[in-house]
Amino acid sequence: MLEHLTLETFKEKVFNFDLNKDWKYEGTTPCMIDFYADWCGPCKMVAPILEDLQKEYGENLVIYKVDTEDQRELSALFGIQSIPSLLFVPLQGQPQMAMGALPKSTFEKAIEEVLNVKKPNIN
C-alpha cells in the first residue's frame, strides 16, 4: 500500500516550503509522487502499476500519493491541472513532472534516468 501525503506530511517527508525558498528534498530515498483523484479513470489505470513498481524497487524507491480533491493546496503548489501527474524527486537536483497514464516501461526509464535508481535484479 502506498502512503498518502497530506500538506503536513509532505512538508516533513518531501519539501518544507515554509522553511526553504529553494527546493530541498527532505527524504533519504528517491521518490515519486502520484497526484490523482478517485474519479479519474487514467489514475485508476496507473495505480496498480505504481503498486507493482513499489514492490519491485522496494527500499530503493518511495512512491507517495496525493489526492488532488483532498489536498488542494498541495496540488496548487505544483500547478496540477491534469491528472494523473507524477513528480519524480531525485536525492539531488530538481524534481521533474510527468503527466498522463504512462506505461510501466516509461516509469522504469524515468526511475533510472531521473531518480538514478536501477531496477533490482530479481532472482
Predicted feature locations:
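A short beta-strand-turn-helix
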Residues: 5-31
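Cys/His/Pro-rich metal-binding microdomains
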Residues: 41-44, 87
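Thiol-based oxidoreductase modules, predominantly thioredoxin-like and allied folds used
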Residues: 4, 35, 47-54, 58-73
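Short conserved loop adjoining the S-adenosyl-L-methionine
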Residues: 21, 72-76
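Short pre-active-site segment immediately N-terminal to redox-active cysteine/selenocysteine motifs
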Residues: 28-31, 35-39, 82
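A short glycine-leucine-enriched loop at secondary-structure breakpoints
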Residues: 77-81
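N-terminal targeting signals for export/organelle localization
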Residues: 1-11, 116-123
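Non-catalytic, surface beta->alpha helical segment in thiol-disulfide oxidoreductase systems
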Residues: 82, 87-122
